[in-house]
Amino acid sequence: MIRKEFLVSGRVQGVGFRFFCKYQASLLSLTGYAENLDDGQVLIEVQGDESSIRKFKTKILNGNGFSRVISIDEKDLTVDTREKRFSTY
């Protein structure tokens, strides 16, 4: 199990992007959260097996049809074993 942080830039606020992330995470049995930042970016922390996180990243890069992702900055994080679901803030 691994945990990643994705800082997503582009048209990602006000277009259902966080809820799209939550849906994709649930399909892949991932936990974590997606949160709007004041600068217009979305911060995502996601946790699960490496191949599912790779699939998740591909899905969010392609977006939901309303969003437009310009870039995703990625960072490795420490696994949170207490986390049980994917949330949006």
Swiss-Prot record:
SUPFAM superfamilies: Acylphosphatase/BLUF domain-like. The active site is at 18, 36. GO terms for molecular function: acylphosphatase activity. Keywords: Hydrolase. Its EC number is 3.6.1.7. It catalyses: an acyl phosphate + H2O = a carboxylate + phosphate + H(+). Residues 3-89 form the Acylphosphatase-like domain. It comes from the Bacteria. InterPro entries: Acylphosphatase, Acylphosphatase-like_dom, Acylphosphatase-like_dom_sf, Acylphosphatase_CS. It holds the Pfam family Acylphosphatase. Signal peptide: none annotated. Belongs to the acylphosphatase family. This is Acylphosphatase. It comes from Clostridium perfringens (strain 13 / Type A). The gene is acyP.
